[in-house]
């Protein structure tokens, strides 16, 4: 039900995480991948920290999946990258290692560079690697927010890799989260973000994506924007009209 709902809302990829206390994660991953592919045609991102669960999902997947994720730890790279190569999967690389998330952009880029080198050495094409520079919460680490955007931009321009980001983490613990999420999403897209992990049911965030694609010429003749919004009235306009009646 969630998969169908998110697909209808405009999601382009579905993240699949079945980890929970007491469950057989490998078996459940296989079961869920099969079930999802029977009801939606969207690509799936298999999200697990356990290589055995990832392989069970990869084994039954039809098409090209995304593995979420590896990080800068050598033992993780050694376990997961061969699976990605074996099954032809793209892979998300988290800019984190045993030291945790580094506050500065340069340290995160250095980890991303190590991940890129390991992926290429494992035979994974560069275009199949997505780097996640990791979003820190503005409520707790406000001074480090821009470091994520800077690291993302450097990964895009200097490392030449694709990028992915969990956008809504930015607003955790703060009121009116949509305002922060939408603004941060726009900042990240301008810095070179390729994939946003976000709620497709958030009309404000989806509107930001569609509008951004028009303004950056990614949506020629505004075709997709017009298809989505030609017959819609913005919520603020609808509310104003209702108050006048």
Q: Where are the predicted features?
A:
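Gly-rich Lys/Arg/Thr-decorated short loops/hinges at beta-loop-alpha junctions or inter-strand turns
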Residues: 1, 7-17, 37, 62, ...
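Conserved, mostly hydrophobic/aromatic
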Residues: 6, 47, 57, 131, ...
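Alpha-helix-loop-beta-strand connector modules within alpha/beta enzyme cores
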Residues: 24-62, 117, 149-165
């Amino acid at each position: 039900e969630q998969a169908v709902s998110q697909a209808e809302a405009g999601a382009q990829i579905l993240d699949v995480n079945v980890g929970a206390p007491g469950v057989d994660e490998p078996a459940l991953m296989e079961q869920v991948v099969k079930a999802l592919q029977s009801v939606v045609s969207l690509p799936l991102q298999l999200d697990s920290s356990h290589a055995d669960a990832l392989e069970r999902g990869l084994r039954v997947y039809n098409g090209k999946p995304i593995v979420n994720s590896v990080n800068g730890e050598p033992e993780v790279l050694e376990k997961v990258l061969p699976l990605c190569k074996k099954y032809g999967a793209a892979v998300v690389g988290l800019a984190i290692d045993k030291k945790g998330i580094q506050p500065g952009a340069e340290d995160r880029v250095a980890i991303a560079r190590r991940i890129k080198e390991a992926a290429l050495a494992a035979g994974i094409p560069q275009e199949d690697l997505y780097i996640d520079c990791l979003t820190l919460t503005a409520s707790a680490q406000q001074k480090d927010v821009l470091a994520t955007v800077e690291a993302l931009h450097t990964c895009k321009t200097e490392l030449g890799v694709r990028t992915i980001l969990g956008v809504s983490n930015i607003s955790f613990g703060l009121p009116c989260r949509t305002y922060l999420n939408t603004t941060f999403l726009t900042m990240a897209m301008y810095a070179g973000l390729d994939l946003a992990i976000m709620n497709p049911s958030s009309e404000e965030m989806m509107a930001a994506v569609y509008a951004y694609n028009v303004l950056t010429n990614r949506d020629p003749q505004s075709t997709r924007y017009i298809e989505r919004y030609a017959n819609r009235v913005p919520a603020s306009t609808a509310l104003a009209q209702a108050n006048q009646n």
